[in-house]
Amino acid sequence: HKPNTAVAQAYYNKQAGIKRITTETGAGQWGCSMALAGQMFGLEVRVYMVKVSYGQKPYRRSMMQTWGAEVFASPSNMTQTGRDALAADPNNQGSLGLAISEAVEEAASRADTNYALGSVLNHVALHQTIIGQECKKQFEMAGDWPDVIFAPCGGGSSFAGIAFPFVADNAAGGRNGKMVQLVAVEPSSCPSLTKGEYAYDFGDSSGFTPLMKMFTLGHDFMPPGIHAGGLRYHGASPLVSQLYHEGLIEAIAVPQLATFDAGVMFAHAEGIIPAPESNHAIRGAIDEALRCKETGEAKTILFNLTGHGHFDMASYDRYLAGELEDFDYPEAAIKESLKHLPNVG
């Protein structure tokens, strides 16, 4: 789904006379999309890829380079932010917040360069709502309507994309009186919505971005090296966060092994190997179907299959070999990270 916003951002940057784009990527889907969009419009693209994913997913790096992008493992020696992080911890595996800091720092130093973000911000959520709009059209054609929607949630772009168009219907009383349950599914190792604090925080580790009110684990939160790299972000989109704060959407956190169980089950049933991020939504959908089986309810379940896992097979290799582990981020560590939230008076 990432090209939905990458192409739009590249187009408008080109119209503004920008020559270069810097950006971050976790698992690499966003970096690939921005590299492709930059190639389409003749923009140079530099991608700071979270180090743990840089090692886990080498072929996404190859894709970005095929489309002409430069790719660096973050934290890197290219920026002061990266150098400081490496000085503090030479084995730092990186985070999306840290990669964002590096990309923003570089963009701020050059007049011909802008920074592009692949999630979190309002315009990204807007571009992604084409997903939910298309779903609504397809349900109208099928003569059906979902009872519940599941989508993975890190920064929030894929969840916003499928859920926001249905939020409008719910606010108006539902489609023919039918309200849709909207569920964001996040990793238990990075539980921004389910365990974070609703507060003003920076979107990056170094505090370069404007403050945003969101559910956050703290901008210097360093998540473990789970294989759903696209969900390793300390906060959730301000719009997603506001909806959750107001009780208009729900959120659940699921452990890593359960998501891979769901991904393999889906591959057996559908012949599609999902991305680790997508497995979170699939886990939610399967669990809902099993609940319906127990209660005898009939529900129409919609979930967002955000991508395939063809470049994530090393992660599946580790799962099949029994080498993956679950990790619930300790409450004490979350509380410690939240102590560093900015004081906004």
Regions found by a protein language model. Give the residues of each.
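Claisen-condensing/thiolase-fold acyl-transfer catalytic domains that form or cleave C-C bonds
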Residues: 153-157, 161, 256-322
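Alpha-helix C-terminal capping segments
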Residues: 7-18, 32-44, 65-66, 163-172, ...
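A short, small-residue-rich loop immediately preceding and capping a beta-strand
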Residues: 5, 16-52, 145-158, 182-183, ...
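Buried hydrophobic positions in well-ordered alpha/beta secondary-structure cores of metabolic enzymes
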Residues: 2, 9, 28, 38, ...
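Active-site/ligand-binding loops adjacent to catalytic centers
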Residues: 79, 85-123, 131, 142-143, ...
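Phosphate/ATP-binding catalytic cores across multiple sugar-kinase/actin-like superfamilies
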Residues: 110, 130-145, 287-291
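Glycine-rich oxoanion-binding loops at beta->alpha junctions
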Residues: 1-20, 120-140
